[in-house]
């Protein structure tokens, strides 16, 4: 079956640095912990120094440990120069320059259905696109398999803004 995904593969020209907060959770508690962390981060996100504009927010779930627990990260993109300057109360998630990423744009109409469409895109990426691509996941190199990127764009000829969701998959040649 041919994949219907639109996938762009390219090495990162510069490091992408995301500063935020994370928590350790497991599959049983992620639906309680995730929204709580989002509310908490929403209250302190304006304190993040050197945020990149336009604003890009990231969500990443790191690879699980042997006991099934994993780190769930939420943060905003900051300037590359901020990577070497830790900020108290926050941690950084860094995608180094040269990292090969596959970018999948996730189309959706209603914001409430974004998570469902992201899950479908992930499944299609791993089951259809990746095996036939000549690439493999590089999650072991960076500690997470993908990053959800949320940003907004203006609609043409309107003042309204639309949320855009992209998935970044960290890959390498097989």
PLM segments and residue spans:
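A solvent-exposed interaction/effector surface
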Residues: 1-174
């Amino acid at each position: 079956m041919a994949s219907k995904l639109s996938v762009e593969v390219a090495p990162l020209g510069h490091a992408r640095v995301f500063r935020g907060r994370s928590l350790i959770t497991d599959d049983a508690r992620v639906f309680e912990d995730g929204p709580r962390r989002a509310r908490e981060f929403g209250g302190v996100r304006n304190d993040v120094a050197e945020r990149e504009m336009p604003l890009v927010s990231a969500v990443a779930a790191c690879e699980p440990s042997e006991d099934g627990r994993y780190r769930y990260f939420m943060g905003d993109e900051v300037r590359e120069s901020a990577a070497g300057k830790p900020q108290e109360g926050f941690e950084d998630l860094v995608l180094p320059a040269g990292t090969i990423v596959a970018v999948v744009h996730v189309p959706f109409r209603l914001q409430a259905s974004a998570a469902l469409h992201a899950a479908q895109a992930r499944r299609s990426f791993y089951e259809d696109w990746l095996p036939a691509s000549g690439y493999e996941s590089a999650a072991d190199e960076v500690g997470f398999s993908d990053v959800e990127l949320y940003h907004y764009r203006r609609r043409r000829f309107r003042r309204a803004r639309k949320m855009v969701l992209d998935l970044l998959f960290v890959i390498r040649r097989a």
